[in-house]
């Protein structure tokens, strides 16, 4: 079981390791300016904030975590493939909304399955999760090497290949039974009434916002400073 989740984490963070540093560069390659790139990537975060809880709520109620992961990964392959034919800001904007909702749901859904499975099957969650971090580092390095030699066009194809790997890895994940129905219809709303949770959300928001400029313009800035992708 630990090997299955290690493979899943490796596949997911293969995609993240390419997407995080190089996706803004691909959008610039497609002719978008700094304001358009910022808008597309910032709206992606808001989409995740609303889509992920809804997707997770459905998975918990139905017990279809694996099925939802497979649909999200398959949807990720399709939506990222659509980037290849999308032309212009608004087409890229709409496709990016769909891709963000699909792609980023894979991480919390996988975390949920892995944390529960680590207790039931008695494996070390940290060692399993480690493979995601290792793959992220390797993906960023190897991705830079490929982009330096093949150009920005290769970025999209590497992400699509990584999403295919995530789809394949999803087949090996265990199925989970549906949870008992809670006493309230949307348990997440209960958290929003807790002061400590709101403070936590505020702290995480500030942490994420401090990374935003680096995530969006880091690679572009380093290129303009004369640093190679590899």
Give the residues covered by each predicted segment.
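C-terminal membrane-cytosol helix-exit motif in multi-pass small-molecule transporters
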Residues: 106, 143-148, 155-179
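Helix-loop junctions at membrane interfaces in 12-TM secondary transporters
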Residues: 2, 83-96
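Residue-level signature of mid-helix packing/kink "hotspots" within the transmembrane helices
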Residues: 45-53, 136-137, 141
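Helix-to-loop junctions at the C-terminal end of transmembrane segments
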Residues: 50-64, 147-148
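Juxtamembrane intracellular "pre-TM" segments in multi-pass secondary transporters
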Residues: 170-208
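Cytoplasmic helix-loop-helix junction between adjacent transmembrane helices
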Residues: 95-131
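Helix-loop boundary and gating motifs at the non-cytosolic
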Residues: 1-45, 49, 197-230
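Structural signature of the two symmetry-related core transmembrane helices
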Residues: 67-81, 160
